[in-house]
């Protein structure tokens, strides 16, 4: 599904953010990427999202090099990926329902589809009773649930969650991880980055450990090093 082949990234100041990273991520996998700040986790995600180009190596999705495709095809590729961030990135003047609906509108979905799908995904993340609340009326965990609902509402193949529990207390972080696991169980590939080893312990699936821009361990048994 997603293959990184000897991917390296060197910036203008000669900093090596990635150094020869090779990974194969299969459909329906749940993959956690762990490492301290500066390990290369965020740069790796930017490669997958085609926000940055590698200095060396290739990133392919379904055997297509994503850094060599046309702009129209790039838009289609990005529609197949949902993103969740540490800082939620919700629209402050829109309710939870409207934030999720906005993602569907941007994708050209119909009003009928929006009315059917938005309540469904908000129920899926256990936020059905607060769909008409504004972000300032929600807790941090609830805001992240809205962000997850927004990420999955257009039925992407992959969810990329970049430090999704970074601003949350341990109990709420566990709840968010359980929601991501539920989404994965429904067939969506999930790629999660974190520096919180406790989060990884709760998941118990494949873990990729990074250090100094390199993969130092890749375990299907939930084992990791930092």
Residue spans for each PLM region:
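The feature captures the beta-strand-to-loop junction immediately N-terminal to the Walker
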Residues: 34-36
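Helix-to-loop junction immediately C-terminal to a conserved catalytic motif
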Residues: 49
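Conserved ABC transporter NBD signature motif
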Residues: 57-65, 77
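Short coil-to-helix segment of the ABC ATPase nucleotide-binding domain corresponding to the Q-loop/switch region
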Residues: 94-101
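Conserved ABC ATPase signature
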Residues: 134-138, 142
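Conserved catalytic motifs of ABC-family nucleotide-binding domains
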Residues: 155
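Catalytic Walker B motif of ABC-type/P-loop ATPase nucleotide-binding domains
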Residues: 159-162
